[in-house]
Curated annotation (Swiss-Prot):
Residue ranges, compositional bias (Low complexity): 177-195, 364-379
Keyword Aminoacyl-tRNA synthetase part of the UniProt annotation: no
Keyword entries, A-Z: Cytoplasm, DNA-binding, Metal-binding, Nucleus, Phosphoprotein, Transcription, Transcription regulation, Zinc
GO terms, molecular function: DNA-binding transcription factor activity, RNA polymerase II-specific; RNA polymerase II cis-regulatory region sequence-specific DNA binding; zinc ion binding
Positions of modified residues (Phosphoserine): S220
GO cellular component labels: cytoplasm; nucleus
Subcellular location: Cytoplasm; Nucleus
Chief site of localization: cytoplasm
Name of this chain's protein: Uncharacterized transcriptional regulatory protein C1327.01c
UniProt biased composition (Polar residues): 1-24, 751-770
Residues in the DNA-binding region annotation: 72-99
Lineage: Eukaryota, Fungi, Dikarya, Ascomycota, Taphrinomycotina
Residue span of region Disordered: 1-65, 176-195, 287-307, 357-380, 751-774
Length: 977
């Protein structure tokens, strides 16, 4: 035993020198067996650890590789034998020159910026390696002298390997003052290996590359990033919980997430199998109490709430400054249904231990052998995971510009909590966070997600004003990466372009938003996302001849295309064309969110209500709507919104051979489709406060509210157009409000400025008393529908505020703005109950708009327009002008007139607020916002503003609402947002 230790130490001390094999049998070439792979020196290797990494690779034909696939640039220039080791071969290491490998592929695997950055990283690594070579040799000598101590940790046979010069932490009990060099036989980095983390890359959106030229071989040399990392032992590591992401993980614990444990069949000979000695002040977590997620993709879709769990304010890091992260001394908790204990049934050969280094921003990884008698079998030392160097198989970027892992996880949590599902459904949440922890999410997606969600994070508000500009730094990098790869269609690029379009719409970059949205549509068409792949849409059995596509990947393709469809309808709300035709879509609607989370295949309908061809009849349920959730019905209602916009704003009304009131008109067909949508809505999806709470429990509360807000908005906007003449159209009056080309689509409403210079109202509508009764009934029903829809929108927004549901979609702001205009007219009407209810709801609308304008710059234009509308009504009332019902003089055939009254039964009933229940206090700041002096006598509008004082509405953020849900005592203003 002592002889083996002596031999191991001898090789370890010689690792920084020539690195030749110590086996005398290798000097005799005659003893090399035929067909045996040879090392770079032409001799047979005595141990697997001494074989170069490329010897285990396969050729394109699938055979064992027998020679070096590619030499470094220096060896090629000198025409000498190259060992092929990475990051530095023997020749370059001997002459202290940078070792650079050039890709042998004719196709560009990454951009020119990334190649330059990769070469710079290798050069810096080599400089650091040369600078500390003597220091490392002294450290190895110290290790040799301490080896004879009885309590020392045994070394592993894998140290007998040629010098690949990885760096790991010292294995001594006392921290060294310098880093220690240890050889590594595997040139592929642990963080970029595809075999070390137990996840399925096939079902991951990040690896779902649907073009053949995007499929990269993980074992290819160009897909391997250097495994040279630096660790300093000057500062003792700080330990936290070693756990992976869970779908129910509180946001306060996200910053303490550590990488997943490797699969039991994973082997990493490049890593030492000995544990790193951790100082006594670190935390030892017993194995029997440590829980990790064995497979997030199989996690049951059971969520506590989309409200964040209550934690102390000091530990709630989402609202603390970025430079001061509080780290709690406890492991994050997981539900019993979604975790697996570290028992005998789940005991990998070795468990990872990560050691931080604040000085060099590196990472060292070692393994704890479960069979080592000198280590504690009941504890696992864990420390915070730092950022690994991104693999060049994905679009890379300078690490200095990449957000820290903690911030990335935080912004991803904010994205799923505030954005995902309200605008687009793009990602599978468990798989996304698993890939994010494994650093396998394409950087273009990481930057795009950070760009959209940064505006909602209080960590970014301290450094950026206004808040909607907080993500611009990440958007710039996402644009660069997207434009570098725009000619290579990929599912991840489509998602990133959609998010960039959404971000630019919020920063008032309407041109960029329009163009990035168009690029996403083109790329989706190139990937044929509008068609099902193969003859088996559900992947029930492998009957297709081509490569099998899992249900999750198929569903991600569908959801990505439906997100493109929604973006097209949002962006084309006015004069812009709609590019996607409903007749060209041949995919089914998204499945229910619970089925999607559990990765269970389900049959749904297409947009026109059909079942896809090729689906076996045995798997088709009696009612396909059982498999359809909020996402599917959201697509259907937005499709109806697009049809209404096309009729009213894109010359559809002129091409209609029938007048709008006729039963056979296109207007009537849209009205019937809206009624059929509401009538066919399952009972579980009909709006109620209980339904909101039920969907809130599965993190679908905001999406559920958005569904019904979109329905009432579409119905109100459609019937608001009744009675408008060619000279009284908001499309001509409020063109400055409707931001053309913007993803934020603002619907038109009827608002005509009043000329009161002579005390007379100039109105284009002809108040003809001889108008027939059919026209009067039609216009009265249309106005009643608009007012009921407006009050329903305010009630849903108020319910969201009471249940702490965060509304952030810009499309919601469009509906709230329309409701404000309708209610402003009713607030000054002759109906007392309708006026008092409208005045109560006006504040709900205004509070949300004033809140959302901090996060979407284009909404500021709507707030300014609301102030003009309000001032117009005040001026009209002050002049003594009474509003009269004006009915256009048009002859309507009552027998052929469309039926509007049937819509009343599906409009959500809102409570009536009597005038006596309204308060007599006013908000001075809101009055001054609308152009009034703070001390103005406004008693004639008694009850317009309830008692809430909104002096601090500009300082309030969405974070204050979330803080209230977590029990933050500093919360004092409740905004619906």
């Amino acid at each position: 035993m002592m002889q083996q230790r002596s031999g191991s130490l001898s090789l370890l001390s010689n690792a920084v020198q020539a690195g030749q094999s110590s086996d005398p049998m290798q000097d005799d070439p005659a003893k090399t067996e035929p067909g045996t792979p040879k090392g770079y020196d032409g001799s047979k290797n005595s141990s697997p650890a001494s074989v170069p990494s490329w010897i285990h690779e396969k050729t394109k034909a699938g055979k064992d590789r027998k020679r070096l696939p590619l030499a470094c640039q220096s060896c090629r220039k000198k025409k000498v034998k190259c060992s092929g080791e990475r990051p530095s071969c023997d020749q370059c290491l001997k002459h202290n020159i940078p070792c650079i490998y050039k890709s042998n592929s004719t196709k560009r695997s990454h951009s020119r910026h990334e190649e330059i950055h990769h070469q710079q990283q290798l050069h810096l690594n080599h400089q650091y390696q040369h600078q500390h070579k003597n220091v490392a040799a002294n450290s190895i000598d110290n290790l040799s002298r301490q080896y004879s101590q009885p309590n020392h940790i045994n070394t592993h046979d894998s140290v007998n390997s040629p010098p690949s010069y990885g760096i790991m932490a010292s294995a001594t009990n006392q921290p060294l003052s310098h880093p220690t060099i240890v050889p590594s036989s595997n040139s592929s980095s642990l963080l970029n290996s595809t075999n070390n983390i137990s996840h399925n890359p096939q079902v991951s959106l990040m690896s779902a590359s649907l073009s053949k030229n995007l499929v990269l071989d993980p074992a290819s040399p160009k897909s391997v990033s250097p495994d040279l990392v630096y660790v300093s032992s000057d500062n003792p590591p700080v330990s936290t919980a070693a756990s992976a992401y869970s779908s129910s993980l509180p946001i306060s614990d996200v910053t303490r997430a550590l990488p997943l444990a490797p699969a039991s069949n994973s082997q990493h000979p490049s890593l030492s199998s000995q544990p790193v000695s951790v100082p006594s002040n670190t935390i030892n977590i017993p194995t029997d109490s440590l829980s990790i997620v064995s497979n997030p993709s199989q996690t049951p879709a059971k969520f506590d709430s989309n409200r964040i769990s209550q934690v102390p304010n000091s530990d709630y890091s989402i609202y603390s400054n970025f430079n001061n992260f509080p780290i709690a001394n406890h492991a994050p908790s997981f539900p019993q249904s979604s975790v697996k204990k570290l028992d005998s049934s789940f005991s990998p050969t070795s468990l990872p231990t990560f050691t931080t280094n604040s000085a060099s921003s590196g990472l060292s990884t070692s393994y704890t052998n479960n069979n080592d008698t000198t280590s504690d079998n009941n504890s696992l030392q864990a420390v915070p995971r730092l950022d690994p160097v991104p693999s060049l198989t994905l679009s890379s970027t300078p690490v200095a510009e990449l957000p820290p892992l903690e911030l990335r996880i935080h912004l991803a949590e904010v994205f799923f909590h505030c954005c995902h599902g309200q605008s687009y459904n793009l990602f599978h949440r468990p798989t996304f966070f698993e890939s994010l922890n494994n650093n396998t999410v394409p950087l273009v997606v990481v930057y795009a997600v950070c760009a959209v969600s940064a505006r909602f994070s209080s960590r970014m508000h301290d450094r950026f004003s206004p808040p909607y500009m907080a993500g611009e730094q990440y958007a710039r990098e996402a644009r660069r990466l997207a434009l570098d790869n725009f000619d290579r269609p990929d599912l991840s690029l489509v998602a990133a372009l959609l998010l960039l379009s959404l971000h630019d719409s919020g920063t008032c970059e309407t041109g960029k938003s329009w163009m990035y949205g168009g690029m996403a549509l083109r790329m989706a068409a190139a990937l044929q996302l509008n068609c099902e792949q193969g003859s088996n849409p559900l992947d029930l059995d492998n009957i297709d001849s081509g490569p099998r596509i899992s249900f999750l990947e198929r569903e991600l393709r569908r959801r990505t295309f439906w997100s493109c469809f929604l973006m097209d309808r949002y962006a084309s709300s006015h004069e812009h064309l709609q590019f996607l035709d409903e007749n060209d879509i041949g995919i089914q609607l998204p499945v229910h969110e619970l089925l999607f989370t559990k990765q269970i295949a389900g049959v749904t309908q297409t947009l026109d209500g059909r079942i896809l061809e090729g689906v076996p009849s045995i798997v088709i349920p009696a009612d396909t709507t059982e498999n359809m959730g909020v996402a599917a019905y959201t697509v259907k209602i937005i499709a109806l919104w697009g049809r209404a916009v096309k009729y009213l704003k894109q010359d559809g009304k002129r091409r209609d051979p029938y007048p709008y009131w006729h039963r056979n008109s296109d207007f009537s067909h849209i009205s019937e489709a809206l009624y059929a949508w509401a009538d066919g809505l399952p009972q579980r999806l009909k709006y109620s406060a209980v339904g909101l709470e039920n969907h809130l429990s599965i993190q679908q509360g905001a999406q559920y509210a958005f569904l019904h807000l979109a329905y009432h908005h579409t119905l109100m906007w459609l019937f608001r157009s009744i009675g408008e003449t060619e000279n009284n159209q908001l499309s001509k009056i409020s063109s400055s409000v409707s931001l053309a080309g913007n993803t934020v689509s603002f619907s038109p409403v009827s608002h005509t400025p009043i000329n009161v210079t002579n005390g007379e109202s100039q109105n284009n509508s002809n108040n003809d008393p001889s108008a027939n009764g059919a026209a009067r009934r039609l216009h009265k029903a249309a106005r009643e529908i608009c007012l009921r829809c407006a009050n329903a929108i305010s009630m849903i927004v108020d319910d969201c505020r009471k249940h702490n549901v965060i509304l952030t979609s810009p499309f919601i702001a469009s509906g709230v703005y329309t409701a404000f205009c309708v209610q402003a007219e009713a607030a000054f009407g002759s109906n007392v109950l309708a006026a008092s209810t409208a005045r109560h709801n006006l504040e709900i609308d205004l509070r949300l708009m004033l809140e959302m304008k901090n996060y979407w710059g284009s909404i500021s234009a709507l707030c300014d327009k609301m102030s003009e509308i309000w001032a117009d009504w005040v001026q009209r009332t002050s002049s003594g002008i009474q509003e009269e019902d004006t009915i256009p003089n048009e002859m309507i055939d009552e027998e052929r007139m469309l039926d509007l009254e049937k819509h009343f039964m599906y409009i959500t009933e809102s409570p009536i607020v009597p005038n006596q229940a309204a308060q007599k206090s006013y908000s001075p700041d809101l009055m001054s916002y609308f152009g009034f002096a703070k001390n103005s006598d406004l008693q004639q509008w008694n009850g317009l503003w309830p008692s809430d004082d909104l002096r601090n509405y500009q300082e309030s953020t969405i974070d204050s609402l979330v803080a209230y849900a977590t029990g933050n005592p500093g919360w004092n203003i409740s905004f619906a947002g």
